[in-house]
């Protein structure tokens, strides 16, 4: 469903969300929309924030950026961390500046946690503590991640049932919260959802950082939000695109890009930047842990899994208009039904 903007145009400025799985054609559609609408693009991609990671993240080309500049890309060094809270702060500032000039913020990407953080805000869980995380990492190296999962099972059985022992990021977060607050992380889920022990199995990331999944909190974002999700109707079409794009990245020099990152000497495969899909598999291959064919197969498979997770989030998303085609006219026709064209004069 697209909101009827006619009753709100005097109070809330519009913004457009263009969401979708990787390789669905979001960038091309966004650039086309900028030709017709007074839009300015804000990237919603947790990998594109990093400088020097261009090929493997499918960043817009210099030619595309000249046509439609993107905000929130190339803003971090790969050695740094960039959180959903950081994104929310930066995106809100960019949206305010864009709408203040009478233009429309167009948020484009597939990092669904970022979209959710923007719509619903962050949970009241504590921020990450780097010193404590380093301590937990040392314990894991000494005793194994299985020992940490056993600790979680003892202190927070609800969380242990949902967090797989191999999901190191979520396991570390759960242990971190317990040690920072002396409370099980599941107690935060319960207080936010209003229930006890009832958590869907859709992914632990739904709960480790955010408020309850389907809470009616979108009014907290001071915009009239028009939400679109772009994805092929046939999963096989998306899978084919993913494979072709991964192979094209390799031809474009993706492995040389990762070699340059490894040669810096200050990066490791445990950093969030190097855990990005494709980079993690390339690091393993260049470290001699995989043969080339296995690397390619794992890179494609990991990208497909990413797309599957993105689609899982989107299928639960409220008030979203699904697009099977990257035809900008479909978006424009939908926006016209809301009355938006009377304010911004587009056909």
UniProtKB/Swiss-Prot annotation:
The keyword Electron transport does not apply. Pfam families: IPPT (PF01715). InterPro entries: Dimethylallyltransferase, IPT, P-loop_NTPase. Gene3D superfamilies: 1.10.20.140, P-loop containing nucleotide triphosphate hydrolases. The keyword Lyase does not apply. The record marks 111, 133 as: Interaction with substrate tRNA. It is an enzyme of class 2 (transferase). GO terms for molecular function: ATP binding; tRNA dimethylallyltransferase activity. Catalyzes the transfer of a dimethylallyl group onto the adenine at position 37 in tRNAs that read codons beginning with uridine, leading to the formation of N6-(dimethylallyl)adenosine (i(6)A). This is tRNA dimethylallyltransferase. It comes from Marinobacter nauticus (strain ATCC 700491 / DSM 11845 / VT8) (Marinobacter aquaeolei). The gene is miaA.
């Amino acid at each position: 469903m697209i909101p009827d903007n006619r009753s709100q145009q005097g109070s809330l400025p519009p913004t457009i969300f263009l969401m979708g799985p990787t390789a669905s054609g979001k960038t091309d559609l966004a650039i086309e929309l900028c030709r017709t609408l007074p839009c300015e693009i804000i990237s919603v991609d947790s990998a594109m924030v990093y400088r020097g990671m261009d090929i493997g993240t499918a960043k817009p080309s210099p030619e595309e950026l000249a046509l439609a500049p993107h905000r929130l890309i190339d803003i971090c060094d790969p050695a740094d961390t960039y959180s959903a809270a950081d994104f929310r702060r930066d995106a809100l500032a960019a949206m305010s500046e864009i709408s203040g000039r009478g233009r429309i913020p167009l948020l484009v990407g597939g990092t669904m946690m970022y979209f959710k953080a923007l719509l619903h805000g962050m949970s009241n869980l504590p921020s990450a503590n780097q010193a404590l995380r380093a301590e937990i990492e040392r314990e894991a190296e000494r005793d194994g991640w299985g020992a940490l999962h056993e600790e979680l099972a003892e202190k927070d059985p609800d969380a242990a049932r949902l967090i797989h022992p191999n999901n190191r990021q979520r396991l570390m977060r759960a242990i971190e919260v317990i040690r920072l607050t002396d409370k099980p992380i599941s107690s935060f889920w319960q207080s936010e959802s209003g229930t006890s022990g009832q958590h869907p199995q859709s992914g632990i990331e739904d709960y480790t950082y955010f408020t309850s999944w389907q809470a009616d909190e979108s009014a907290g974002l001071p915009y009239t939000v028009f939400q679109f999700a772009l994805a092929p109707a046939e999963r096989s079409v998306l899978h084919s695109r993913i494979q072709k794009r991964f192979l094209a990245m390799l031809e474009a020099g993706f492995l040389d890009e990762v070699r340059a990152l490894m040669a810096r000497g200050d990066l490791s495969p445990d950093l969030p930047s190097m855990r990005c899909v494709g980079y993690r598999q390339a690091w393993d291959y260049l470290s001699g842990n995989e043969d080339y064919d296995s690397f390619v197969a794992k890179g494609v498979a990991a990208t497909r899994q990413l797309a599957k997770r993105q689609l899982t989030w989107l299928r639960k998303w409220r008030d979203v208009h699904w697009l099977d085609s990257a035809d900008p006219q479909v978006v424009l026709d939908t926006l016209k039904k809301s009355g938006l064209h009377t304010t911004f004069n587009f056909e």
